[in-house]
Curated annotation (Swiss-Prot):
Name by which UniProt lists this protein: Tyrosine-protein kinase wzc
Organism of origin: Salmonella typhi
Annotated metabolic or biological route of this protein: Glycan metabolism; exopolysaccharide biosynthesis
Signal peptide span: none
Positions of post-translational Phosphotyrosine modification: Y568, Y707, Y709, Y710, Y712, Y714
Family as reported in the entry's similarity comment: Belongs to the etk/wzc family.
A Pfam family reported for this protein in Swiss-Prot or TrEMBL: GNVR
Cellular component annotations (GO), alphabetically ordered: plasma membrane
């Protein structure tokens, strides 16, 4: 014989135990974790297939320095060539002035949407290649009384269509021809769809569509103070978003040109009004000068007076130029602005010089003073008049060749690929989310519903553990097979004591057999009851195999299936269910002939019988006591398999007739609280439970180290 002993030392560090338990809990639930993660990933894949793709189009525009008006050029020089105000231009691009014209140009206030199944319909149409079907509607109006109605356009074929509403309106139209009926006007320019395809036609307000465009439009400056703006527009239709963005850039350019042209026009109007007045004043000044010369016999000015006169004329010309500049700059800034203050300071300096020159003129003889004054008026008037004529010609050229300050660098183009949804990112995120949620769920379930994880946990609370039965992999592989209706069916070969008598679980049951031999020596009778804390914990498995291993010691054993609701021992042992316990207790069968032999020697069975409506009442009858007395006198051991004590009271009733009671609890399933509650139920009924059998102990992912177990395997040599 060869003995293999596997021993693991108990871990004493509490922190290490907790970490190991958490990791082990996750590893044990790995299939649930992987399944949950796979479901999340599958949902993500389905979403990416059926989600509406969002595309992106972009364009590039440049805002150049002001180049149309010479007056504005001079102002820019006063502003020290400050770069264009990109923030203001961005707001202008997003304004109702620009976007409203785009809505009108492209008829964006009219929406035509293909009718599909909810949620997945549009995605299915894309997968089938039918997402490009369209109807182009350029005109659609309806009375205010019909504003709440839903209009549906149905394609009839041969360039015909039918327009109906949920309010009872119905009309037929032809492509390219206006439809007018009951105040409803529609013009369809093109149809590219199969007959019987339906579309919903909606009319939105211009303001609502402008808001929609603003939500989908992004304008950013490329670099800092470059004056280059990047426009991005997103939407579901690749062609439409390109057309919308091209329209926005075109309308922005046109409004800039229109504004510049309007500016030049206003300046021309101002000059046209001023020129006659200036010419009139010039004529008056010339007449006065000529009259004075004739009166004084053509007086000549000395060189000093002529120099003063030239300086005064030059200063007047500069002051007049500043007047034009001030007229322009006052439209842009207040007097507190640095540029405006610079202009005012320059004017003040010229006026101071002019005052000094006037002082010098005052010191001259009166005749020279008058000649200087009249000559200055004429020459200043001539300069002003010529300036105005030059400005007029410049503005006429500017108005005729206005190009604005905006240049479209890159027209709109739709980027290849899909902007949203990002399939790889969504799938990866779903996998991570599914993994995290499943792990958190496993840990929370383990935290709030921690089952018994060691016999020591029971013994520390004063509960005797009679046996610790490991989970049998052999039994697990040959366990119940479910039929179509979900009812468990068993085969006789599945009884572990017969199919694999050397299994560790059977060795543990043999150890239990030895313990019972001494435990029942002082019992009032040879009747042993096995009950359970809850259902599906392997109680019947323990009971049947215990009966089998005891019968192998040449003792006569009778197993009574007292679970008249769900008992299946007859299927497990390969006997019939005729004349079972319920039939005997109901008086339909004889006690003396109720025991049925099984395929195992010295092992008889009383099956549960037909399912009665009142199992508890039958167990309380005197006939059940007679059955127990009869069985106790004819068998060496009577085993009674009862339902779980927490589910029904049958075990408490049967317990009054037995000498020994053991309770089965399942490892990592039943909690300590459940065991204590079950024992309390028996105490309330005056029944003493000898101890607990801990069933289905399995090697956890963290091993048996947590419990300091010793696992023995003793097999025959292969020689």
């Amino acid at each position: 014989m060869t003995e293999k002993v596997k021993q693991s030392a108990a871990v004493t560090g509490s922190d290490e135990i907790d970490i190991g338990r958490l990791v082990g809990t996750v590893i044990e639930a790995r299939w649930w974790v992987l399944g949950t993660t796979a479901i999340f990933a599958l949902c993500a894949v389905i979403y990416t297939f059926f989600a509406t793709p969002i595309y992106s189009a972009d364009a590039l525009v440049q805002i150049e320095q002001n180049a149309g008006n010479s007056l504005v050029q001079d102002i820019n020089s006063a502003l020290a060539n400050k770069p264009p105000a990109s923030d203001a231009e961005i707001q202008l691009i997003r304004s109702r002035l620009v976007l409203g014209k785009t809505v009108d140009d492209l008829d964006l206030d009219i929406a035509v949407t293909k009718n599909t199944f909810p949620l997945f319909g549009a995605g299915w149409e894309r997968l089938m290649g039918r997402h490009n079907e369209m109807v182009k509607v350029t005109t659609f109006t309806r009375p205010e009384t019909m504003s709440g109605q839903i209009f549906t356009l149905k394609v009839l074929g041969d360039k015909r269509y039918q327009l109906v509403s949920d309010g009872g309106f119905s009309a037929q139209g032809v492509v390219g021809q206006p439809l007018n009926k009951d105040g409803v006007t529609m013009r369809v320019e093109a149809i590219d769809a199969r007959p019987d395809t339906e579309f919903t036609v909606s009319k939105f307000s211009t303001l609502g569509m402008i808001n929609n465009l603003q939500n989908n439009l992004t304008v950013t400056e490329t670099g800092k103070d470059t004056g280059v703006l990047n426009l991005t527009f997103t939407g579901e239709d690749r062609d439409q978003i390109r057309d919308i963005l091209n329209s926005i850039t075109r309308n922005y350019l046109q409004q800039d040109i229109a504004w510049k042209s309007e500016e030049a026009g206003k300046s021309l109007a101002f000059l046209a009004k001023q020129l006659p007045e200036v010419r009139s004043r010039l004529d008056v000044a010339e007449n006065k000068l000529n009259a004075f010369r004739q009166d004084k016999d053509s007086v000549d000015l000395p060189l000093e007076a002529k120099a003063v006169l030239d300086s005064m004329v030059n200063i007047d010309a500069q002051l007049n130029e500043l007047t034009f500049k001030e007229a322009e700059i006052s439209k842009l800034f207040t007097k507190a602005h640095p540029a405006y203050r610079t202009l005012l300071e320059k004017r003040k300096g010229l006026e101071d010089k002019k005052a000094k020159l006037n002082g010098r003129v005052t010191a001259m003889p009166k005749t020279q003073q008058e000649i200087v004054r009249l000559t200055r008026d004429v020459e200043s008037g001539q300069q002003v008049y010529m300036q105005l004529l030059n400005k007029q010609q410049e503005l006429k050229i500017t108005e005729a060749s206005t190009v604005g300050n905006v240049r479209i660098v890159d027209p709109a183009i739709t980027q290849p690929g899909v902007l949203k949804p990002k399939k790889a990112l969504i799938i990866l995120g779903s996998i991570i989310l599914g993994l995290m949620l499943s792990i958190v769920g496993v840990l929370l379930r383990s935290l709030f519903n921690r089952g018994i994880e060691s016999p020591q946990a029971l013994e520390e609370h004063g509960i005797s553990v009679y046996a610790s039965i490991p989970l049998s992999e052999w039994q697990k592989a040959r366990d119940s097979v479910k039929t179509i209706k979900g009812i468990k069916r068993y085969k006789q070969s599945q009884l572990l004591a017969v199919g694999n008598p050397t299994d560790l679980a059977i060795e543990a049951i043999r150890s239990l057999r030895t313990s019972l031999h001494f435990a029942m020596m002082q019992a009032q009778n040879n009747v042993l009851m096995l009950t359970g804390v809850s259902s599906s914990i392997g109680k019947t498995f323990v009971c049947a195999n215990l009966a089998a291993v005891i019968s192998q010691t040449h003792k006569r054993v009778l197993l009574i299936d007292c679970d008249m609701r769900k008992g299946y021992t007859h299927e497990l042992l390969g006997t019939n269910n005729v004349d079972g316990l319920s039939d005997i207790l109901a008086g339909k069968g004889e006690i003396a002939s109720c025991a049925k032999p099984t395929a195992i020697a010295n092992f008889d069975l009383i099956p549960r019988g037909q399912v009665p409506p009142n199992p508890s009442e039958l167990l309380m009858s005197e006939r059940f006591g007679e059955l127990i007395a009869w069985a106790s006198s004819r068998y060496d051991l009577v085993l009674i398999d009862t339902p779980p004590i927490l589910a029904v009271t049958d075990a408490a009733i049967v317990g009054r007739h037995v000498g020994t009671t053991l309770m089965v609890a399942r490892y990592a399933v039943n909690t300590l609280k459940e065991v204590e509650t079950s024992l309390s139920r028996f105490d309330q009924n005056g029944i003493q439970v000898k101890g607990v059998i801990l069933n289905s102990i399995f090697r956890r992912a963290t091993g048996y180290q947590d419990y300091g177990y010793y696992e023995y395997e003793y097999q025959s040599d292969s020689k």
